[in-house]
């Protein structure tokens, strides 16, 4: 039953979407904005291609390819993408080009990969070597950026660049552990300002003040996806990534709600205004189950990923009498600084809109489902009849 429901859900979203106006991108849907090359669509297309790999259904491949082809031109240029914008978020969607290039052999995808990779050659960096999250966020590292850039970076270097930049990628993870991990809890702060000048940054440590769930979900899956992309020849580097991930999971599960889900502000479960959030929970579920499948962490950890996925099913996944499917509990956006006074406080994180059927929740939910399905009878998810 769940298999059919999720298939129907994905196909509905695809049928109601175009590259110009994807239904799953609530930041532009219905607002009259032109769609651009972005990480939100990148995540959804990644999930759609995962559905194709799992089912072999050509509808998924064709939909993903058509979407990407709206942006990627024959000469390898990408409509609306400018490397000199120096926005790490814009790297993420290019991860889909590796698979499309492998499947089709079309040179435009390789040229587009080279174009996106060129951004990293001149992306501004903090003194310790990490990429700035965006050119507009000087001297700042956000956990989000690890997911947006590092799996792409490691994959490109391994496939096309004789592993030249692999050590650089690993060093950036090591700096995050050094600068953004909280020694007391083992959790990671959302952002780090090397200059200590931002109003949200601790003047001593440069860290932002709270543990935002989706940022930790991005980081968790960044560790697993980058580890997967790292050559077996780099044993110590792969071991560092898997050990770091296991340490993170050990910290997170202490804060897992009895429902299986995680809280928007991770360590403050039950505090008034806090809520169980879908996107971060789904990212963590995906990361845990994928890491178990790839033997990065022991089988005993799978229970936490399955419990997280089932928690989402129980609380936020619904099917109406007329068959309409909804996935709720998704934080639309959250960040630090910028034009809005985003100060990283508890009050800030719980103030952002909560929406339904948005890619930042839908995409990792689909990927978590596929990881569960890979473990179990695909027609039945543990705990659900």
What function would you assign to each model-found segment?
Residues 2-40, 59-61, 70, 74-88, ...:
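CBM-like carbohydrate-recognition segments
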Residues 3-24, 62-79, 111-130, 163-192, ...:
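Long, well-ordered core segments of solenoidal/helical folds
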Residues 55, 104, 156-167, 226-239, ...:
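Inter-helical turn/loop segments and adjacent helix faces that build the functional surface
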Residues 72-79, 125-135, 195-209, 263-273, ...:
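Acidic/His metal-coordination segments adjacent to aromatic residues that form catalytic metal sites
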Residues 144-159:
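Acidic/serine-rich, low-complexity amphipathic helices located in mid- to C-terminal regulatory regions
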Residues 220-269:
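Oxyanion-binding "anion nests"
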């Amino acid at each position: 039953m769940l298999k059919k429901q999720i298939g129907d859900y994905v196909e509905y979203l695809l049928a109601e979407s175009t590259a110009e106006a994807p239904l799953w991108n609530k930041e532009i849907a219905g607002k009259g904005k032109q769609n651009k090359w972005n990480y939100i669509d990148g995540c959804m297309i990644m999930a759609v291609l995962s559905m194709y790999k799992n089912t072999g259904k050509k509808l998924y491949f064709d939909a993903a390819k058509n979407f990407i082809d709206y942006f990627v031109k024959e000469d390898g240029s990408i409509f609306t993408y400018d490397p000199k914008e120096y926005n790490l978020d814009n790297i993420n969607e290019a991860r889909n080009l590796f698979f499309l290039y492998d499947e089709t052999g079309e040179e435009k995808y390789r040229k587009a990969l080279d174009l996106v990779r060129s951004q990293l050659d001149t992306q501004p960096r903090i003194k310790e070597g990490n990429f700035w999250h965006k050119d507009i966020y000087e001297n700042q590292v956000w956990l989000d950026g690890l997911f947006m850039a590092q799996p792409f970076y490691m994959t490109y270097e391994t496939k096309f660049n004789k592993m030249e930049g692999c050590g650089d990628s690993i060093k950036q993870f090591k700096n995050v552990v050094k600068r953004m991990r909280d020694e007391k809890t083992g959790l990671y702060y959302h952002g780090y300002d090397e200059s200590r000048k931002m109003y949200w940054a601790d003047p001593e440590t440069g860290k932002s003040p709270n543990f935002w769930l989706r940022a930790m979900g991005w980081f968790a899956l960044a560790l697993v996806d980058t580890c997967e992309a790292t050559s077996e020849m780099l044993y110590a580097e792969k071991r560092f990534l898997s050990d770091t991930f296991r340490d993170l999971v050990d910290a997170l599960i202490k804060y897992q709600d009895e429902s299986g889900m995680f809280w928007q502000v991770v360590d403050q479960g039950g505090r008034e205004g806090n809520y169980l959030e879908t996107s971060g929970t789904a990212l963590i579920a995906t990361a845990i189950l994928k890491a178990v499948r790839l033997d990065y962490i022991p089988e005993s950890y799978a229970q936490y990923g399955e419990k997280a996925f089932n928690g989402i099913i129980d609380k936020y996944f619904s099917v109406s009498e007329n068959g309409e499917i909804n996935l709720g509990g998704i934080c639309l956006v959250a960040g630090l600084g910028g034009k809005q006074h985003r100060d990283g406080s508890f009050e800030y994180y719980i103030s952002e809109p909560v929406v339904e059927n948005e890619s930042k929740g839908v995409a990792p939910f689909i990927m978590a489902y596929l990881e569960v399905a890979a473990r179990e009878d695909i027609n039945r998810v543990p705990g659900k009849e």
